[in-house]
């Protein structure tokens, strides 16, 4: 079942992430927001879709020195701890993937990168804070779209491990 929020949905085609969720018969909601020319940060997106900041998650794609890719899903108001990220995937060091390669590798663009439905299956890790929530907002697979999904469904669909990934702010 899909529940759609937002006035722009009627003009929008389903993304790969939505088609995969539909095929798997996973319940989710879709919400949209107006996209601007500038990069919109997660805090702004949370406000635009009426979500609590801790419910909105961003998808980061990192790579090792051999250009093997890993996906990390963390709250938009948090910073990925690169050492923790490398440790949980048994790598010495990881770097953010160059933005100019994101679409080629994942099929998605910056600001529209969903952990569901990438071109290839990558090892995915979701921040442990998601376990404290029933549902989370993730990118719907294009800028201006957010999927609201049960945490356990997200974990199952991405075959993710759940680990503490965020920097601890003191």
Q: Where do the model's predicted regions map?
A:
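Extended, low-hydrophobicity, polar/charged segments
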Residues: 2-168
